[in-house]
A protein has these predicted regions:
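C-terminal helical cap(s) of enzyme catalytic domains, especially alpha/beta-barrels
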Residues: 113-117, 211-229
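Conserved N-terminal beta1-alpha1 strand-loop-helix module at the mouth
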Residues: 1-76, 139-147, 157
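Glycine/small-residue-rich loop that forms an oxyanion/phosphate-binding "nest" at active or ligand-binding sites
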Residues: 54-114
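Glycine-rich beta-to-alpha transition loops that act as phosphate-gripper elements at the mouths
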Residues: 66-67, 74-75, 108, 128-130, ...
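Glycine-rich phosphate-binding active-site loops on the catalytic face of alpha/beta enzymes
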Residues: 93-102, 154-161, 202-221
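Hydrophobic faces of well-ordered beta-strands that scaffold small-molecule active sites
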Residues: 5-9, 37-41, 62-65, 92-94, ...
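Active-site rim beta-loop-alpha module in soluble metabolic enzymes
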Residues: 116-185
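Catalytic cores of alpha/beta
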Residues: 131-139, 190-204
């Protein structure tokens, strides 16, 4: 199975910095045929990223950081799935802990976003804490569950240098895989220094945020993942 590395820029970087970053990681991808890099820039930078990747042969999939739970219509300020599709988006994060915490998104909100994404052929990347697993899967139909990818991200372990304990990650990933055959990633303080230990676990990829902002740091993670898998 192809190992996934998902880089989430959150609200970092300006447009020129994004394209410079894309160029900088390209050589590492040429040496990593069994790995797929997914990149989630700011929604504002998806058009420029799409244009850049359309003219440069870099094997990177574009990811949206969020999507409207509504179809096209009178929803001021919302960006719907069909609009994301127009700019080459193939995946979209949904249910990130920061969206659940700061924007009070519910499990049903996430399920509505999943429905919109799947209707446009975009793969949802559903972020889950341990506490989200049961209610989030309950909000999804059986058909939807296997058409997504999943990211276990314990909120307490985001933005630091230490991951969740490996036994906790292993147990939680197993819980998620009881519901689905889809890929399951781990996210939460993934760094070049600790990613090798994560590769001993039955995960299908990693979600990288802070450590992805520096191209050399992300390149080191790609290299480790590529040689270990």
């Amino acid at each position: 199975m192809t190992f996934l590395v998902l880089a989430n820029f959150k609200s970092h970087k300006l447009e020129a910095e994004v394209t410079t970053w894309l160029s900088a990681v390209a050589p590492a991808l040429a040496q990593s045929p069994r790995l797929k890099l997914l990149v989630a820039p700011s929604l504002l930078h998806l058009p420029a990223s799409h244009t850049y990747l359309s003219t440069h042969p870099i094997p990177i999939d574009l990811v949206a950081q969020d999507v409207s739970p509504f179809p096209p219509g009178a929803y001021t300020g919302a960006i719907n799935a069909s609009q994301l599709k127009e700019y080459g988006v193939t995946y979209s994060l949904v249910g990130h802990s920061e969206r659940r915490r700061y924007f009070h998104e519910t499990h049903q909100d996430v399920a509505n976003k999943v429905n919109e994404l799947l209707s446009c052929g975009i793969t949802p990347a559903i972020c889950l804490s341990r506490e989200d697993i049961v209610p989030q899967f309950a909000a999804l139909s059986d058909d939807q569950q296997n058409k997504c990818i999943y990211c276990f991200e314990p909120p307490a372990d985001i933005g630091g240098t230490t991951t969740a304990p490996l036994d906790v990650i292993k147990d939680t990933v197993a819980q998620i895989k009881n519901y689905t055959t889809a890929p399951v990633l781990y996210g939460g303080s993934v760094t070049p220094e600790n990613v090798a230990s994560l590769l001993t676990l039955p995960i299908d990829g990693v979600l990288v945020a802070t450590a992805s902002l520096d191209a050399s740091s992300l390149t080191a993670i790609i290299s480790t993942c590529s040689h270990a898998r």
